[in-house]
């Protein structure tokens, strides 16, 4: 999806690099490029940031011997990270029951976010939104014997939602609230 905007578009590359500095960490949640390994290599040389790739179904270039993996710190299908004391579950495909989903901080705020792509802005995304609301409206009894709602913080990081602009976790959370 990034490649759809960036390939052949100096403005997209300039805008992106205007926000992303050399040492910023950038996690791409799949479908980086529909191009060949050579085309993807060329694109990657022009992007700022320390890059990490969660592989998507269109990232076929990764399996090509001509692809230079050195531009990435790591390439994985799934990862769990920490960002400001929050757990972040990353996968190209949405995971409806993700690790850490029930974890809350001292104030009762969810501590875990599941970031995904793949479904774009499709009927599948509408179904996921319905699932999220059903889950949030479902009550359960916590360890203290109190009734609580089930947290469900799945965020679709579809690049068109952010106008192809790289966003921080806080920015994705805020954008997701407004959608």
Ranges and model annotations:
Residues 1-8, 13:
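Single conserved hydrophobic/aromatic residue that forms the stacking wall/gate
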Residues 7, 28, 115:
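Conserved Rossmann-like nucleotide-binding pocket used by diverse enzymes
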Residues 14-19, 42-45:
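Short, basic/hydrophobic alpha-helical segments
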Residues 16, 31, 56, 90, ...:
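Divalent metal-coordination and catalytic microenvironments
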Residues 21-35, 52-60, 156-159:
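Active-site neighborhood of divalent metal-dependent phosphoester/pyrophosphate hydrolases
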Residues 21-23, 47-51, 86, 110:
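Short glycine/proline-enriched coil/turn segments at helix->beta-strand junctions
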Residues 30-47, 60-72, 99-103, 125-130:
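Metal-dependent catalytic neighborhoods of phosphoester/phosphodiester hydrolases
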Residues 69-179:
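Conserved beta-sheet core of the metallophosphoesterase superfamily
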């Amino acid at each position: 999806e990034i490649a759809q905007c960036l390939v052949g578009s100096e403005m997209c590359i300039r805008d992106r690099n205007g926000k992303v500095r050399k040492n910023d960490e950038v996690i791409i949640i799949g479908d980086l490029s529909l191009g060949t390994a050579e085309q993807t290599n060329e694109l990657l040389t022009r992007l700022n940031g320390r890059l990490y790739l969660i592989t998507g179904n269109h990232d076929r270039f990764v399996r090509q011997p001509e692809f230079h993996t050195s531009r990435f710190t790591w390439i994985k299908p799934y990862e769990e990270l920490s960002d400001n004391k929050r757990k972040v579950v990353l996968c190209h495909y949405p995971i409806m029951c993700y690790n850490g989903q029930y974890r809350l901080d001292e104030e009762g705020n969810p501590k875990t976010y599941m970031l995904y792509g793949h479904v774009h802005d499709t009927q599948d995304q509408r179904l996921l939104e319905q699932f999220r609301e059903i889950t949030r409206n479902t009550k359960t009894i916590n360890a203290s014997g109190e009734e609580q709602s089930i947290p469900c913080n799945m965020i679709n990081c579809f690049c068109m939602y952010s106008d192809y602009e790289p966003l921080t976790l806080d920015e994705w959370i805020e954008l997701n609230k407004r959608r």
